[in-house]
Each structure stands twice: as C-alpha cells, then as structure tokens.
Amino acid sequence: MSFTAPSDPVNKPTKVKVSQLCELCHSRKALIRRPKNLSKLCKQCFCLVFETEIHNTIVANNLFQRGEKVAVGASGGKDSTVLAHMLKLLNDRYDYGIEIVLLSIDEGIIGYRDDSLATVKRNQQQYGLPLEIFSFKDLYDWTMDEIVSVAGIRNSCTYCGVFRRQSLDRGAAKLGISHVVTGHNADDMAETVLMNILRGDVARLEKSTAIITQSSGSPIKRSKPFKYSYQKEIVLYAHYMKLDYFSTECTYAPEAFRGTAREYMKNLEAVRPSCIIDIIQSGENLALKAKKSNAGKRVVKFVDGNRCARCGYLSSNNICKACMLLEGLEKSRAQVAIENDTSADGAALKLRALEKLSF
C-alpha cells in the first residue's frame, strides 16, 4: 500500500502556466499584455523594451545631434515626467551627447498649475537638470484664470493652446535653445488626427502626424519621441519606475473638444487595441494623398510667410493668432469694465477709450 505525504502549501513550488510567462525572458510571470502587439511581458522586460523602443525611435528619426541643447516641455504630468526621466536615462546609456533643460510654462491656473510646477521642481532635483519657468502673465500680461473670466470656459483650450505653444518657443529662444521636445504620445496624436478629420481639416494632418516639425524661417524645431508610445504604457512605466508626477486633470479640460475625441478613442480601443496606431497611420496616408510628402517620417517644415507686425512672432498672416486673441481679450475686458460701471460719466469715458483702442 503506497503512502502519499500531504502537500506543504508553504514550501510547494508555484507552477506558472507557460501562457503566463513573459514572452521575452521565459522565466518571470507576465504582468502586462501590450495593446499594440498583444505581447505578454514581465515588469523588468516591459521597462527594458519600452526604453529600447524610445531609443530606436530617436535613432531612426535622427532626433538629436551631438552637442545639441534640448528643452523638455515639462508640465509635471505623466508624459513630460517620463520624457524627462527617459531622455536623462537614454542620454547617459547611449551617449547622445545632448544637454537637457526643463522648460515649464506657468499658465496661471490657481489650484492646478501651481501644484504641478511643484512637481516639476522636485523632478529638477531628482534628475539633476536645470529648470526655467516662463509665465503667461510675464509674456502676455494675462493669466488663464483671467482669460476664462473674460472669454468663458468653453474657449479656454483655444487660448491656452495658442499661448502655450508660443510661450515654449519664446522661452526656448530666450535660452538660446533651438530644439523643444514634448511628451505628446500616440493617444494624443491619434486624437488630433481624429479631431482634424471631424473638422474636415485635412490640411492639418501632415503637421499633426509628423514626429518633427519646424516652421520655415524659425530657429525652433519640435519633436515627439513618444509618437508611437501608448498612454497606458507611459503610465505603467511611470508606476513601475516609481516616478514622481502630477496626475490631476486641468480645471478647464472637461469642456474641451479633445475630451469628446478622447472618449470616442477609448471606446474604439476597447474593441480594437491597435486603433491608436492605425489612426495615426491613416492620418499619415491621408496627408500623403493630400500633399505629396513624407509626413511622419522626417522633418516637416511649414511656410509661415512672414512675421507678426505686432510682436514679431512667425505667422502665416500679418497678425499672429496670439495677438489676434489678445486683441479680443483687451476689447472684452474694456467692454466688461463699461458694463460694470454704473455711473453714466464713467461709462461714457470708457466707451470712448474702447473706441480708441488700437492693437
């Protein structure tokens, strides 16, 4: 009669099914299934693969030149925090020979940007990188909170987008930097493609899908090393690497059109995980058909034609978009002052002042 010893639940080795093992190392348990190719990886292999993919994107697109000074658009959010960490890591690992500077813009949103900038300042200490901060108030004499009080919340992203893009360029120029790197990821780019299609604005597809953009005559170029990186994987990488980032959504973001596109993208991704890259590639193909070029592959330069007659910033029109928005804000502020003045004499004086406003 045979006797079988009782199993020891403590010392009994745990058998992991082959299907649950990491497809790269075949030894550790897989913890993630990547949406872009459905590969199953462990924590360590995922981080290594993610870093290697970013490096390959940088090399394949020749993003950096040795000796170049590069500004990382740092907001304190997950994308820019991972980007700053990644560039510092890869620059040390592969010897790109670049100088990295954190460049932040303070839009003036109390309870949001002031907290996120505190995160950026911690990142500065953690990564040992220099930090420069420029504010809307200093550059335009307006904060986003002031803009919203005059223009309304529904238009907030229009103002913020235009002023922020120009602020990054102005900040970089003041620092003598000709290359700004941003944390735009695959989800962001797919959303932009979708928004342009919904607007019927096919002409913008080339710029929205290019990994490097630069206006003709401008010394500032921009690049997006995370073009092919899914937002989910960026968040997961930040979690695994225990990175310090700010995760609160902008106070004014829920009213943005992009939020609608984002929700639609999430629904699509639930059905077809590869839809994000598919949409980017579709945008590239549509841009190629609309204009014979190599959109998304090399540097895409855009002809602006001249400089703004008011501020000197590059513009396709006589007056740049930022100055046009500022003109509207100043007129609105003057009109609000008139409406709030209960005295007839005061209102009349302000009305005459409004009529004389020139920009």
UniProtKB/Swiss-Prot annotation:
GO MF terms here are: nucleotidyltransferase activity; tRNA binding
Gene name of this polypeptide: NCS6
Q: What is its EC number?
A: 2.7.7.-
Does the keyword section mention Heme? no
KW tRNA-binding (keyword) present = yes
Q: Check the record and name the Pfam families matching this protein.
A: ATP_bind_3, zn-ribbon_14
Q: What does this protein do?
A: Plays a central role in 2-thiolation of mcm(5)S(2)U at tRNA wobble positions of tRNA(Lys), tRNA(Glu) and tRNA(Gln). Directly binds tRNAs and probably acts by catalyzing adenylation of tRNAs, an intermediate required for 2-thiolation. It is unclear whether it acts as a sulfurtransferase that transfers sulfur from thiocarboxylated URM1 onto the uridine of tRNAs at wobble position. Prior mcm(5) tRNA modification by the elongator complex is required for 2-thiolation. May also be involved in protein urmylation. May also be involved in protein urmylation and in invasive and pseudohyphal growth.
The organism's taxonomic lineage, starting at the top: Eukaryota, Fungi, Dikarya, Ascomycota, Saccharomycotina
Q: Which family does it belong to?
A: Belongs to the TtcA family. CTU1/NCS6/ATPBD3 subfamily.
The lineage's top-level taxon is Eukaryota
Which locations, inside or outside the cell, does it occupy?
Cytoplasm; Mitochondrion
Pathway(s) this gene product operates in, as recorded in its UniProt entry:
tRNA modification; 5-methoxycarbonylmethyl-2-thiouridine-tRNA biosynthesis
The entry's keywords: Cytoplasm, Mitochondrion, RNA-binding, Transferase, tRNA processing, tRNA-binding
According to UniProt, the name of this protein is: Cytoplasmic tRNA 2-thiolation protein 1
